[in-house]
Amino acid sequence: MKLKQLTLALSALFLSASAFSATEADVEATFSPYKNGFPKAPGLTPGMTINKANVDQFKDILALGTYRVIKEGWTEIKVGNTTNFDLPSSYVDATRKNLNTAKLGPNNGDIVGFVAGRPFPEEPDLKDPRAGEKLAWNYKYGLNWGDNASIEPLTLTLRNMSTGQVERRLKLEFHFLNFKHRIKDAPVPAVPDNASNLFRSIYMKVQEPSDLKNTQLLIQRYDDDQKLDDAYLYLGFQRRVRRLATGQTTDAFLGSDLMIEDFEGYNGRVSDMKWTYKGTKNVLLPMWNHDELPLTDEFHDPEGYKFVADGGQGNCFFQGTWQLRKVYVLEAVPVNPNHPISRRTFYMDAQLQALNGAIEIYDRKGEIWKVWSVGKSHPDHHLPVNKGTGIGIDDAFQMVDIQAKHCSTGQFKGKIGYKQNPPSLFQVQNMRGSD
């Protein structure tokens, strides 16, 4: 590139960054989107049910995938009150303290200057060609499960949606640890002795059934988003750890309808996708108070905890309430042309900036393949350990393959700030010694 062209390009990049810089008002708005009132829609009232008979009336406030499964008569949803999911003051304060320190680099997946908090709290702008990428960074450095947490158990059920037959049921445990950019739980701001410069790790272990018991998965994500994740699988019957090839994160996970890349809504790097912000609208998302839902003691938790019930066609749909939320519509197209999907559409909650409330997954032909939703409970209406944490609790999920008429559902018992999450749990050596 000639010097003049380089100068013009750098100038344009600088002007773009300046034009979309955040202000103190943006910080207030991003964490308090309902300060001036909750969204409304004609005919929508808390307590009502949206079903096949009336769904067309509410099509504009439903994610396309949600509309499809209701229109087919497979499920119906009950509308709840819109509520505030206030994030921890430590995260808000970190955002304010580090305002405008984070900048995008020249390539998708490049970020410099990020310390902690929400990196890009300004309202996304359709005129900003990288607005979608900024939202993706907000998700990566968001508070899905906080600095550290555990789910034990997560009950994963595989079903034939046409008949409701349970084909397989697994009991899993999941553990999450942020090594860097921590905002609340000691050690802050980072776990020491992190020579590999990891940002976050996920560790999973199968408890049941017996033929899969002690199968383990470890994902290590680097702070440098351009660096490929390290992923390892331990198969108990083989008693050996093997490293997963990159493409295996898009294989069916333990025979379910999920890929590893689907975890938490999206479990990949920012640089793995081309992100496009499609606009802001009000959409119904599954967000609720756990203690106010239809609950089941089917799984007989020894502590008396009751899980969100399933229902609808084939028992493929969680029985939680949905509330009208401000969302950012975000499209992600895989950079890898051999990826098994053509794109995902996320309806990102503007307050939490999580990606898992409502998602459509499209096949290589561009047709909807799966409808993916994770319902969140307000922490103050969940387990005592979660009260006051300010972390939306992933409470139940439904992954519905609308082409194959198959589903995978999940019920969580998640705990925030779980102390039995030592860094050693997230090392390969731990997998070998956990039999």
Predicted region positions:
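Bacterial N-terminal signal peptides that target proteins for export
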Residues: M1-T7
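Solvent-exposed N-terminal domain segments of exported/luminal and surface proteins
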Residues: A22-D229, L235
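Non-transmembrane domains of secretory- and envelope-associated proteins
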Residues: A22-E123, Q238, T249-F317, R325-K326, ...
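Beta-strand-dense domains in secreted/periplasmic systems and polymorphic toxin scaffolds
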Residues: L244, A358-I359
